[in-house]
Amino acid sequence: MGKKRIYELAKEINVASKDILETANKKGYDLKNHMATIDDNQEKTLRAAFQTKATPAASKPATPAAPKASEKSESGKIKINKTAIRRRPEADKKPAQHSNNRPQANANRNGQASNGQNRTNNARPNNNSARPNNSRPNTNSRPNNNSQNRSTSANHPMSLQEQISQANARRQRTQERIQQQREQREADEKKRREQANRPRPTRNNASNNRPSNGKPTNGARPTTNSPRPTVTKDGRPLGSSRPNNNNSARPNTTNNRPTNSRPATTPSRPVSAQEMQQKMQANTVSASKPASNNTASKPKNFGPDKKRGGGYNSYGNSQQRFNKKRKKTRKQQLAEQNAAKKEMPQRKERPLPEVLVFSEGMNVADIAKKIHREPAEIIKKLFMLGIMVNMNQSLDKDTIELLATDYGIEAEQKVEVDIADIDSVFETEAKSDANLVSRPPVVTIMGHVDHGKTTLLDNLRNSHVTDGEAGGITQHIGAYQTKLNDRLITFLDTPGHAAFTNMRARGADITDIIILVVAADDGVMPQTIEAINHAKAAKAPIIVAVNKIDKPGANPDHVMEQLMGYGLVPEDWGGDTIFVKISAKTGENIDDLLEMVLLEADVLELKANRDQKAVGTVIEARLDKGKGPVASLLVQQGTLRIGDPIVVGNTFGRVRVMTNDRGRRVKEVFPSEPVEITGLNDVPQAADRFVVFEDEKTARAAGEERAKRALLKERSRSNPVTLDNLFETMKQGELKEVGVIIKADVQGSTEALAGSLRKIEVEGVRVNIIHEAVGAINESDVTLAAASNAIIIGFNVRPTPQAKIQADAEQVDIRLHRIIYKAIEEIEAAMKGMLEPVYEEKVTGQLTVRETYNVSKIGTIAGCIVDTGVIRRDSGVRLIRDSIVIYEGKLSSLKRFKDDVKEVKTGFECGVTIEDYNDIKIDDQIEAYVMEEVPVK
């Protein structure tokens, strides 16, 4: 059990914290304030000390022992008063009787003591003037000594001094009231003696149950025959407070009236609930018998009462209805109180954990579940520690540790694992060395364009795969399996064009062995060198296949000499690189090549664990019209099964259908086997890694988090304008843009085309790739192109009929290509066409002014001779005087003799006028030129 604080103990034993601190300090405990903690032994000691003090005080109200010497004899009344208040529920259990002489149950219900007199209604004194007339129902047994204490609230806790002072005040009021009652009784006795000789009215006792002016009648009516009895100062009929003892027609009320001459100072014994109930039953019986006789002789007084002012006494009727309702309620209360109360189920107290494992940012509700406590209790504890929180508010590390210390348990922060970091999971799973078994080698075929890579793979498939196999060789990266000597080999085919550099790099990363295909008639080419660099970067062994040895002019030795310059020395020449001379077209030496591959695989000792979760790499991805996103995967570790939750790059899903390289559906895929899967939520990027998770919920969370991070990373690429790059930004703003939307059949082609377009360099124009995706050209692509004024390039895809109609309507240019060269050339031409034309000045001829003529309305006409070249009608001219350009403008007219001509050649004379210029002099030189457009380089 944990330690307890002083304020908590004070609440439990209902003692002030200050008193507990004083007692604890007297006992030698070093406690500073109410927040100090105590152990179990100290708690027991303090509880015992305060229980010892509280025992006498608690027993005072119930003990009828003699009062102390310091108290008066009235102290017994104080105790009775307190006892009566505390026994209020027992008093409520008594049956309610509608009779003339109700006992003191009402007095107890109002929180007042009976004072040991058991006074009935017939002995009611006349001092109730402070009580409002219409405030009580039709009960004639209400005692008169509760007018002073009706508003006293006995349910509020008071201190002992306050209780003593209130008791003294009540005792003083009681003595004064008793003295008044004595005087009133003496006066009443005197009046009754005078009235004893007078005749009684005929209506004897019929109005016992009817109120008069809102006050219950006590059975004593005036003997005069007047319609209204005389009224005393307090509004009560004179003489109605006590019955006439000499009247033989009235019931024997003296049996129920106790003597009121008992001294007030006599201490009375507390009345138990059983005694009070017996007295109530006795009074009810004694009052009900005479009442039945009286009512039998005379009907009840319903209807209008002439003596009471006429009309129906609705007040009495409503009070009777109220009494019935209240009587029914009391019965129900009695039944409910007597019924066995069902015990509330107790909350099972679960023990606190030894260690609270938390993560930063947990709220109160989370902590409550971990430590098996109510959130309200934790909020209260934090409040006492000076921390205001609500149930859903996140808590920091210090607050959680402080709370754990207060509960007496240790706090340990949970190590957070980034589920979105699948690269770390991939590396961990890939390095697993348990349950290792042999796996097929993964071989990548690389080389320059048209050196025979696809032909070689086609020959391998046709030679070692059953006839009638579905599918064929594609132009994209693809994975296929072939068998030799009952051993599988997985081949990856990569494009050889320069635009597919990323594809070749991906193939080199996931491969075990690289076959470099070099044409014997072509030699080493740029993509051959690039493939060598990829292989060296991946640290994969290279097997050189010298192809096309069947062609005339083939020189394999020249190829071997060239490759020695790149570090590939043949084994025959003392190196460690395997060279195989093959012909992919005829199939020559193909089996030798496969045997070399298996030999190299044996040297590498390739193994994998089939029992773990599958991890691998995306070879290619595309969007199929019927299947949705389709990804070609290469499993590198573990076993991939249908239904596995999987995260592929920034996408996630559950494996629905798996198809192998032959087009057949499979249920599980082992390491080094290629497979096509469906069931992803989006098309992943090629070369993305995939990891299988335990459940779909975790996979979904990881995939969504990765997609979110990728989006944020994409947005952060836009460089904000700063003072450092302001000039560059302004220059870029002056550039023209060619908007392009790329749609291709596979993800790798999309990347290759986008990368090639970005490399086009035309001064003043740049390519802006607005969108690149996999799949057919649809209406949303056309809408985006129309909004951004872009060109749509489709690579091995076609537009849908709706997209084609929409493109024609919105005049969107869609260009479809199957060869990447043509797509690049077309975009380059479009970029050059966006540039403003550049013009270059070309001088066509020179003239010398021989004579000038001034003609009105025309201006000055210059008679010239063409010295060199040709002068045309649309030429621009410069007027040069003393080697200084005086004017530059256009010709207004060009004539030979009187005829307008288009041009005048060297040696001929002509007349010219210059537009808007007349200051021409003899011997001036006129230079003619034209502006010619310069083609964009």
UniProtKB/Swiss-Prot annotation:
Domain tr-type G: 438-607
GO molecular function per UniProt: GTP binding; GTPase activity; translation initiation factor activity
GO cellular component: cytosol
Polar residues bias: start-end ranges: 97-116, 154-169, 202-229, 274-298
Region (G4): 547-550
Keywords attached to this entry: Cytoplasm, GTP-binding, Initiation factor, Nucleotide-binding, Protein biosynthesis
Basic and acidic residues bias (residue ranges): 173-197, 339-352
Low complexity biased stretches: 52-68, 117-153, 240-269
Residues the record lists as binding GTP: 447-454, 493-497, 547-550
Annotated region (G2), positions in chain: 472-476
Keyword Protein biosynthesis: yes
Region annotation Disordered: where it falls in the sequence: 47-352
Domain of life of the organism encoding this protein: Bacteria
Family to which this protein belongs: Belongs to the TRAFAC class translation factor GTPase superfamily. Classic translation factor GTPase family. IF-2 subfamily.
Record-given protein name: Translation initiation factor IF-2
Organism: Latilactobacillus sakei subsp. sakei (strain 23K) (Lactobacillus sakei subsp. sakei)
Gene for this chain: infB
